[in-house]
């Protein structure tokens, strides 16, 4: 960025500074950087308001441009009209307009960096306004990244790879780099050498094996043993092993998909929690509006988000999708999922009756006590009959217990006397 012109000392001693071509361009390009990482609003209106505030703050950062004589009177007026309450159309064109002004002021095309472009989209899916936000975002991205003649290049980072059809349908010349790509394999985390060197430097050399279990496991392309940099840095700062990554990613979306998934999906998820591997096809492009209808898409999302890692790639292909052997990435992810599942039960525990609560913790004595109290205080002879040889009492008790178990229908498979011939 030209904000750091003549600040070469920031890079001295680093490998990148040894390359002359990088030294020559350091501090010469105007850079527009903005992040959607904190856009986690639960309504469309609040989300758009937050995006507009980010755009307004960008303009404030370059407020001096609004007074530049190189702008026409109309352009100065447009510059000063950027506000929190600007129209959607103005907001969608604001970044390309700013690119125009900066390019002319500095005499060079701009570089645009957008961090976590997909965070508001995840919230939109979870909270039910995906279609509205996708439409707005598609127009914003089209003007910013496709029809922008003042753009040198752009980089967008995200937790998931949103499908081209969702918001990138208007964009060309996209180069997509994912966890399975061989490009930039060591750029997204600490290698084992880097991680272990940092442990030695901070006096934690004896913690290497424990740190490996908790924070290793990420796989990028052909490189294994990539460590979570956020967790490593937090450990070095606090000296305590913990789930530092737990609230920094797409947990809300993952929780929704697993919690609302069918019985087969929950069964596979349970296998992962037991430390077992799963075999499934993967499609790295996430089509959000199809997630509810495609139970296998959750595994693609978990892989893209870093919760799962590739153990091996099978030769077999299912449809157009490659078959992968996957496992949970590390102990930190396992601990995070345990907390997530416990949270589900805490939220729903109050909705379970006493009999179901006793059943879930295998407390047979409490189950018997509950049934005895109900039988003595509520049941009538007309309900249970007077002769044990009759079928009617058994049917009554059967129906009563089935009614008690209805609370579990969303989380467990509850069947009753299916016509199976037994």
Predicted regions and their residues:
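P-loop NTPase motor core
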Residues: 4-64
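Structural recognition of the conserved hydrophobic beta-strand(s) that form the central parallel beta-sheet
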Residues: 33, 111-115, 135, 139, ...
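Substrate-engagement module of ASCE P-loop NTPases
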Residues: 59, 94-106, 132-152
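Short glycine-rich substrate-engagement loop in P-loop NTPases that contacts/grips substrate
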Residues: 80-99
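Conserved P-loop NTPase "ATPase switch" module shared by AAA+ and STAND
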Residues: 106-130
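Amphipathic alpha-helical segments of the small helical/lid subdomains adjacent to P-loop NTPase cores
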Residues: 166-170, 177-235, 268
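Extended alpha-helical interface modules used as scaffolds for assembling large macromolecular complexes
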Residues: 174-175, 226-422
């Amino acid at each position: 960025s030209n904000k750091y012109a003549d600040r070469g000392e920031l890079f001295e001693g680093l490998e990148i500074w040894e390359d002359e071509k990088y030294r020559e361009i350091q501090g010469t390009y105007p850079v527009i950087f903005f992040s959607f990482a904190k856009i986690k609003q639960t309504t469309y209106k609040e989300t758009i308001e937050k995006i507009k505030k980010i755009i307004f703050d960008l303009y404030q950062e370059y407020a001096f441009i609004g007074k530049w004589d190189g702008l026409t009177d109309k352009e100065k007026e447009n510059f000063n009209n950027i506000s929190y309450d600007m129209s959607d159309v103005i907001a969608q064109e604001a970044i390309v307009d700013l690119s125009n002004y900066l390019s002319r002021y500095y005499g060079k095309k701009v570089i645009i960096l957008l961090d976590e472009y997909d965070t508001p989209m995840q919230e939109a899916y979870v909270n039910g306004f995906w279609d509205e936000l996708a439409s707005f975002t598609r127009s914003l991205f089209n003007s910013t990244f496709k029809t922008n003649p003042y753009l040198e290049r752009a980089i967008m980072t995200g937790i998931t790879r949103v499908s081209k059809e969702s918001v990138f349908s208007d964009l060309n010349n996209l180069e997509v780099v994912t966890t399975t790509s061989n490009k930039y394999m060591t750029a997204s985390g600490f290698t084992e050498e880097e991680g272990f060197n940092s442990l030695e430097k901070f006096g934690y050399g004896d913690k290497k094996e424990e740190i490996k279990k908790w924070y290793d496991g990420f796989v990028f392309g052909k490189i294994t043993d990539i460590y979570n940099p956020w967790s490593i840095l937090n450990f070095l700062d606090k000296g305590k092993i913990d789930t530092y990554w737990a609230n920094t990613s797409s947990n809300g979306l993952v929780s929704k998909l697993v919690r609302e998934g069918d019985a087969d999906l929950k069964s596979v998820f349970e296998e992962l929690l037991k430390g077992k591997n799963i075999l499934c096809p993967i499609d790295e492009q996430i089509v959000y509006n199809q997630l509810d209808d495609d139970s296998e898409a959750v595994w693609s999302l978990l892989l893209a988000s870093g919760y799962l890692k590739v153990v091996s790639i099978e030769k077999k292909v299912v449809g157009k999708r490659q078959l992968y052997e996957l496992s949970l990435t590390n102990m930190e992810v396992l601990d995070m999922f345990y907390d997530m599942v416990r949270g589900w039960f805490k939220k729903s525990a109050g909705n379970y009756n006493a009999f179901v609560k006793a059943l879930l913790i295998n407390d047979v004595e409490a189950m018997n006590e509950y049934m005895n109290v109900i039988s003595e205080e509520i049941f009538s002879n007309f309900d249970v009959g007077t002769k044990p040889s009759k079928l009617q009492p058994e049917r009554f008790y059967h129906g009563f217990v089935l009614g008690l178990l209805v609370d579990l229908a969303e989380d467990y498979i509850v069947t009753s006397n299916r016509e199976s011939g037994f």
